[in-house]
């Protein structure tokens, strides 16, 4: 029983850490009331992500089932005493609402700014006055230094105007232009 309870809390903490440190979303961890908990669970814990409108989005849950489901489905294992025992079970998960939460947290009227840790491209180097001597070479050198530092980066040396490029990559969610 203790191991299952520890697993329930471990997963809750993993989710909270992921939301805060990877997705850059503030969270509140808590325990659901008896009326709110998962049907059949002894305890349900939640990670609530805080949105800009001051509302919370339930983004992940972790449940401790005890041995109730194991008894209902006659699930047993042989213990150290070679006798059958019902395991204590857990269940935990996040859902696609996490994607909506990212958009609600990091989006605005101009698009989405993805958190740097999940952005496919973290930095786009946009040369301005690319027709002037040395500008493209300097921009390429900057891109290369960023890549060498492990930053997912690219340079846009297309014929589109700098303004178009800034708008395009802002809309695509690139964190740094």
What are these regions (language model features)?
Residues 1-177:
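NTP/phosphate- and nucleic-acid-binding module
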